[in-house]
Amino acid sequence: MLYRKGAVEGEVPSFISNFTSSLKYDRKIAKATVKVVMAHIEHLCEINAINTNICHKILEILKELYGGILEKYPNGKFEDIHEYIEYYIINKLGEDVGGYVNLGKSRNDQVATAIRIVLKDEIINLLEGIIKLQHTLLNKAKEHVETLAPGYTHQQKAQITTLAHHFLAFYDALDRDYERIHGSLERIDASPLGSAAMVGNTIPGYDRAKVAKKLGFSKIVENTEDAIASRDFILEAIFNIAILINNISRFVEDLILWSMNELGYVVLPEHHVATSSIMPHKRNPVTLEVIRAKTAKVLGYATSAYALLRSLPYSYNLDLQELTPILWKIIDDCKEILAVLSDLLSRVRFNEERLLKSVSENITLCFSDLAEYITLKYNVPFRKAHRVLGEISKRKHITLHSISEYLREKLSVDIKERELEEILNPIHSLKRKTVTGSPNPKEVRALINKRIKSLLDKESKLSRLRSKS
């Protein structure tokens, strides 16, 4: 080990070095770390802190390492990727040249910078995944603007909606997730480099903002202690992703329930189901079940991340190296979930006949419409109309005639059967709902068009952001 020569000496037993080493997790930031070292060395050369010849030699080795570090990834006794990079350079150039590589920086600011570089890129990957899923949802919504479906509250049929309206509800939740995750980029996009261990360096002319610009950052983390101690940008990203995952889990649970034989609203794509080893008739929703399980794990990871940072004293502690594997795992799981769910939704079929039967066979799904109608037309207090219709709903057999008779008896209102048929018709029920955001097909089409335009604009902006990263 390169760093065990000085205040700390001697070989460390492998079971100890393996325990404290982050090398197996550092592969994710390996190229970014080389990039950070290159920017730092270039700047040291620019301000004449090191000899130009030495600088060029180090940069040559770094370029070589950048192109092949993943293929040459170490499996020896190194504390982390940072020690390995310095060891590699010194081993190639000797200490008289390679020994300058860590001048003015520390592993502390180096790792914090590399994490932010990779996280920026991964956030963009996630945002692209959300956009793809949103495109799929809008396409499905366009197909099912007039496909009636039962809306549920308390897992019981409540009112009549459409599949398109349901898809747009999930779409809008994803939109908020997108904005939250995108917003975290502002806090991530700040360079810690030049903060060294925690108080900066003594090199005359070292310009942290200039080095930040080399690395694609828009600004620096100004306070040098905050720069190396802070991981709240990771927590922010993790919890924003956890909210996204939670929203996904709710929609996925709907699909699982809808695929049950008892409901049969959904026919899942062939490659998203599996059969039983003993029951030949089974079509198990396996990908949705794995998504559901992974969403639970993400919440566990998020809790671990919070607990890891809770009460951790300033400034740097090696506890922090246990945080980044959690971050990468959450991101990898989320990207996978977005891709799998997008594929499933693009191929899923809905049993429109079963959905229509589900809403048509239950006349009470339009009783809230009828209560409003009675109040508005006959000036009957809504609570009174609500109570009387609730009494009707308890009956075993409900017909238009029995409704008309009971309303006449209890409320002294004369609503003919033909009039009731119109009010309680599922399609007419939707068309009467003219408030913004309702499942009225006309309103839903307007919502879809508005979101198509917004999504294309969002996609264009993200593409420009990707080109800068």
Whereabouts are the PLM-identified features?
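Glycine-rich cofactor/substrate-binding loops
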Residues: 1-36, 97, 279-469
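Generic, well-ordered alpha-helical scaffold segments in large soluble proteins
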Residues: 40, 44, 61-68, 88, ...
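A helix-coil-helix interface module used to build multimeric assemblies
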Residues: 1-191, 197-200, 205-208, 272-275, ...
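Residue-level "edge-of-site" marker
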Residues: 57-58, 225, 388
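Short, well-ordered beta-strand elements within core beta-sheets of diverse protein domains
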Residues: 40-50, 118, 165, 233-243, ...
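Secondary-structure boundary/capping residues
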Residues: 98, 146-149, 220, 264, ...
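Charged, flexible cofactor/metal-binding loops and thiol motifs
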Residues: 115-123, 127-128, 142, 156-311, ...
